[in-house]
């Protein structure tokens, strides 16, 4: 019988347990995206709390496109020394750390003004109103290279891997979704074409970082829109193609935060009312189960993971190997240590999402 505290290997990463802290923007970097003591403290507390691997909040890959205020940056080499010092601290505390990288596209809300915001097509974010301009092929080439250069900096900074953000309405998922991608060239239309952007990003990163450095993707299972969005079958195609290309792991997510209908129907990535009953937990599990059956790459399940026994049952009854938690570890950074000690109570997190409204994205029940 497999357990959630098995020691395993994810690519070249030695995992002390099957738990990851999923990416969460904390808004604690400085205005240019550089590390602060406050931000480092958040990750150090998580590492002391026992989680095997931490994925950072997303880091932006080009200086002129910071999607949200005080998010981490990785757009030039000035970040490498401070991140090397940071990753050394996390490793000394016993955790691995992976950096998630992103280009926001029309998910950008910060200092938009007259800036040109790129997207697969000229379109508008239904939730924020941010407009994007259709990218030229030269723009696409530039961004593919920006992702690759950022990933190389991630490696030089001592991170254990890099994760491409391919969900929630950010640029990669905009390309994947026919809801927003209306292109008529080789980057639009069929799922083979809509996937071309992320396939090129992956191949460019692999060429920069080498064969052994772990590359992951956080991939939308579906937009969960009634009509015209990314479907589960299309997403499975993208995941399988990335597996063929050599991706090291796929973190499953879903929901498009830029589509008003999705957010209104509570079908985004951070759903509320998860704590009502066990059958509302792990809400992307059906897709993750299918994906784990169709690829030999490790599948990481995110989204509403709460009860220890539910996750352990999924571990043993399916091919899902790892479990990502964000909001529960915001409420209880030492949750994994509690579980390891035998205290298997469900997390205190109520999935109310009020943490997203606080300074530093802190649980409102912990603020004194």
Give each language-model segment a name:
Residues 1-368:
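Flavin-dependent oxidoreductase catalytic cores
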């Amino acid at each position: 019988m497999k357990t959630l505290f098995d020691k395993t290997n994810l690519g070249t990463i030695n995992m002390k347990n099957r738990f990851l802290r999923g990416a969460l923007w904390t808004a604690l970097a400085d205005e240019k995206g550089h590390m602060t003591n406050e931000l480092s403290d958040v990750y150090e507390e998580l590492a002391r709390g026992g989680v095997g691997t931490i994925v950072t909040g997303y880091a932006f890959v080009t200086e002129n496109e910071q999607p949200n205020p005080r998010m981490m940056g990785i757009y030039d080499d000035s970040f490498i020394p401070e991140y090397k010092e940071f990753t050394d601290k996390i490793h000394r505390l016993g955790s691995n750390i992976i950096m998630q990288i992103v280009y926001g596209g029309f998910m950008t809300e910060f200092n938009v003004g007259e800036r040109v915001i790129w997207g697969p097509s000229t379109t508008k974010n239904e939730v924020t109103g941010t407009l994007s301009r259709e990218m030229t092929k030269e723009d696409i080439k530039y961004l593919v290279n920006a992702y690759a250069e950022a990933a190389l900096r991630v490696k030089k900074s001592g991170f254990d891997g890099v994760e491409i953000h391919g969900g929630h309405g950010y640029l990669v998922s905009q390309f994947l979704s026919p809801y927003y991608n209306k292109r008529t060239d080789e980057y639009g239309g069929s799922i083979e074409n809509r996937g071309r952007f992320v396939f090129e990003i992956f191949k460019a990163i692999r060429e920069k970082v080498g064969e052994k450095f772990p590359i992951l993707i956080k991939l939308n299972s579906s937009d969960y829109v009634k009509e015209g969005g990314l479907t589960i079958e299309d997403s499975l195609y993208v995941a399988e193609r990335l597996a063929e290309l050599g991706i090291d792991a796929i973190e499953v997510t879903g929901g498009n935060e830029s589509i008003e209908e999705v957010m209104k129907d509570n079908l985004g990535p951070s759903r509320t009312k998860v704590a009502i009953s066990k059958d509302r937990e792990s809400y992307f599990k059906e897709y993750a189960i299918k994906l784990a059956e169709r690829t030999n790459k490790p599948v990481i399940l995110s989204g509403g993971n709460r009860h220890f026994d539910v996750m352990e049952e999924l571990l043993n009854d399916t091919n899902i190997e790892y479990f990502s938690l964000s909001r529960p570890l915001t409420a209880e950074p030492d949750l994994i240590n509690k579980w390891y000690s035998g205290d298997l109570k469900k997390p205190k997190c109520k999935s109310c999402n009020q943490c997203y409204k606080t300074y530093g994205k802190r649980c409102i029940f912990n603020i004194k």
